[in-house]
Amino acid sequence: MTALKVGSESWWQSKHGPEWQRLNDEMFEVTFWWRDPQGSEEYSTIKRVWVYITGVTDHHQNSQPQSMQRIAGTNVWQWTTQLNANWRGSYCFIPTERDDIFSVPSPDRLELREGWRKLLPQAIADPLNLQSWKGGRGHAVSALEMPQAPLQPGWDCPQAPEIPAKEIIWKSERLKKSRRVWIFTTGDATAEERPLAVLLDGEFWAQSMPVWPVLTSLTHRQQLPPAVYVLIDAIDTTHRAHELPCNADFWLAVQQELLPLVKAIAPFSDRADRTVVAGQSFGGLSALYAGLHWPERFGCVLSQSGSYWWPHRGGQQEGVLLEKLKAGEVSAEGLRIVLEAGIREPMIMRANQALYAQLHPIKESIFWRQVDGGHDALCWRGGLMQGLIDLWQPLFHDRS
């Protein structure tokens, strides 16, 4: 069989995203490809194609940024790395005509953040990879899952929901803001007994990575009880950074304004042990804040990559929630908590480990998970579903 000429049309048609080969039981060598639309270096103005892999080459690693290399005389850019057999994560490419970003040999963490901040608005998904979405920072990303990546409940066999989610506009008097909220119901349980889940960053889980088919599938398979789901739009990054980190006004508005509005549309149980509040990053911090301050309403907390360093980004000081727990100003007694963090997000992992150590006396009601991933929705989506399953498991015993 004749070998295909590198960079030819038939060669590109043989590529379907990253390619890998096993090195040993634990590691794979993975190669990424990008096709330069301008052609070879003779015609193209592209100087760099940066590879941004969440938890591998991103700013959380404090490592040297990685650029693809062009195969001389072709339209082919490539980059090779090694990944664990159970790794899962998102990635994007950043082609640029600039060669002056990351010009310092060993940039520090702040220089890395600033460099990526300049580049990420130009990021693109991998054109060879069919599985892509708009990431939390607003740019497109693609998915990569190695052969032994852990199963993500429900995402393997989604089912179309019987009734679509209902989108409403919540005009908050307390917050002086209007935003979208999605209400979704599953199953046919008695309305007043249905558990409630409040999902922060609702626009992402409603639109970028819709959870409706997955929740439907898990309910049909009796891994989740029939329930009411409320997804709250963060509006934008500015509002998100103000409202989610330990903001009493936000949670008072949710309880006094939003939940009565939702209940008129889709009745649910008032019991705290049937109520989950779930979030990621600032949302994870916010979820635990809600549980600690209003345990009579929010008895179950699902926190993924929670920003427990807040408000001290450098990670040199303890975050405010940990300080309050240590001082006895708040207590997690009586809460059921899922605490999840990725080993590839070092500062967040350290903050979560410190929090877990403080919560250890009530470890019977805490699900602590370390995942081989970074600050990444592709990892969070599996943990979100597993967390709901774990937190609501006692409800199946209640019904038996």
UniProtKB/Swiss-Prot annotation:
One of the record's GO molecular function terms: enterochelin esterase activity
Activity regulation, free text: Inhibited by N-ethylmaleimide.
EC code(s) of this entry: 3.1.1.108
GO CC, one annotated term: cytoplasm
Induction context: Expression is increased under iron stress. Repressed by Fur under iron-rich conditions.
A Pfam family: Enterochelin_N
InterPro entries found in the cross-reference section: AB_hydrolase_fold, Enterochelin_esterase_N, Esterase-like, Ig-like_fold, Ig_E-set, Mycobacterial_A85_antigen
UniProt record, GO biological process: enterobactin catabolic process; siderophore-dependent iron import into cell
Superkingdom to which the source organism belongs: Bacteria
Knockout or disruption consequences: Mutant is unable to produce linear DHBS compounds.
Chemical reaction(s) catalysed: Fe(III)-enterobactin + 3 H2O + H(+) = Fe(III)-[N-(2,3-dihydroxybenzoyl)-L-serine] + 2 N-(2,3-dihydroxybenzoyl)-L-serine; Fe(III)-enterobactin + H2O = Fe(III)-[N-(2,3-dihydroxybenzoyl)-L-serine]3 + H(+); Fe(III)-[N-(2,3-dihydroxybenzoyl)-L-serine]3 + H2O + H(+) = Fe(III)-[N-(2,3-dihydroxybenzoyl)-L-serine]2 + N-(2,3-dihydroxybenzoyl)-L-serine; Fe(III)-[N-(2,3-dihydroxybenzoyl)-L-serine]2 + H2O + H(+) = Fe(III)-[N-(2,3-dihydroxybenzoyl)-L-serine] + N-(2,3-dihydroxybenzoyl)-L-serine
UniProt keyword Metal-binding present: no
UniProt similarity note: Belongs to the Fes family.
Quaternary structure (record): Monomer.
Known role: Catalyzes the hydrolysis of ferric enterobactin (Fe-Ent). Is responsible for the release of iron from ferric enterobactin. Also catalyzes the hydrolysis of iron-free enterobactin (Ent). Cleavage of ferric enterobactin results in a mixture of three hydrolysis products, 2,3-dihydroxybenzoylserine (DHBS), the linear dimer (DHBS)2 and the linear trimer (DHBS)3, while cleavage of iron-free enterobactin yields only the monomer. Hydrolysis of ferric enterobactin is less efficient than hydrolysis of unliganded enterobactin.
Family matches, as NCBIfam families: PRK10439.1
Protein name as annotated: Iron(III) enterobactin esterase
